[in-house]
């Protein structure tokens, strides 16, 4: 809501047009008049939060972005400097280094932190690895194990997810509050007609 108050449009992908998280987790379109952040509805909530902050960092740096891949949170990954910077901004805000007091963390420690901060195990692992809190000799095995569990969890969520849902609620969520409000106000002020407003919203303007 605070981002939208600042004039940043925040929406999500459409539920009936699924985009794999491996292809896109978050998207930022830089525009001085109407900047857009789009999150992938298919992603886990904790991952959407990370993606939102990551894309918000792009907003302040005025750099467009498409974030993807299962391990894009790894700040040491072979990606460009801009992406690494935005990853680190999001990581520090969500899991401050000052709170991570142990010298090294094992899998139990990773899971404990993930539970406390309501973040995914893979995010916590990469955060700890980035600041040198994962023992070098254990990093490879831990990464493989947690990545495997992460992929299995994603598949489980996909099987359990209700692919239908409430169409109007899903579309409101996809459009974002700011977009819905602007279209509805324009209709109520007679600046656009009923057909145009409903076409923009992808549902009847009366449903707002």
Q: Locations of the language-model features?
A:
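Active-site hotspot residues in diverse enzymes, especially metal/ion-binding acidic/histidine motifs
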Residues: 1-208
């Amino acid at each position: 809501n605070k981002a939208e108050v600042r004039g940043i449009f925040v929406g999500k992908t459409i539920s009936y047009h699924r985009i794999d998280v491996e292809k896109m987790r978050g998207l930022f379109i830089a525009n001085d008049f109407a900047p857009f952040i789009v999150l992938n509805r298919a992603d886990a909530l904790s991952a959407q939060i990370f993606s939102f902050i990551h894309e918000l960092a792009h907003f302040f740096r005025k750099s467009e972005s498409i974030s993807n891949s299962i391990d894009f949170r790894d700040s040491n990954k072979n990606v460009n400097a801009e992406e690494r910077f935005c990853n680190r901004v999001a990581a520090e805000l969500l899991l401050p280094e000052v709170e991570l007091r142990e010298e090294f963390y094992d899998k139990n420690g990773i899971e404990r932190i993930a539970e406390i901060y309501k973040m995914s195990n893979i995010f916590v692992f990469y955060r700890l690895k980035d600041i040198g809190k994962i023992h070098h000799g254990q990093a490879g095995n831990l990464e493989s194990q947690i990545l495997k569990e992460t992929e299995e969890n994603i598949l489980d969520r996909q099987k359990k997810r209700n692919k239908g849902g409430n169409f109007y609620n899903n579309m409101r969520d996809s459009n974002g509050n700011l977009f819905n409000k602007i279209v509805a106000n324009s209709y109520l002020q007679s600046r656009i007609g009923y057909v145009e407003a409903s076409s923009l919203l992808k549902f009847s303007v009366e449903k707002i």
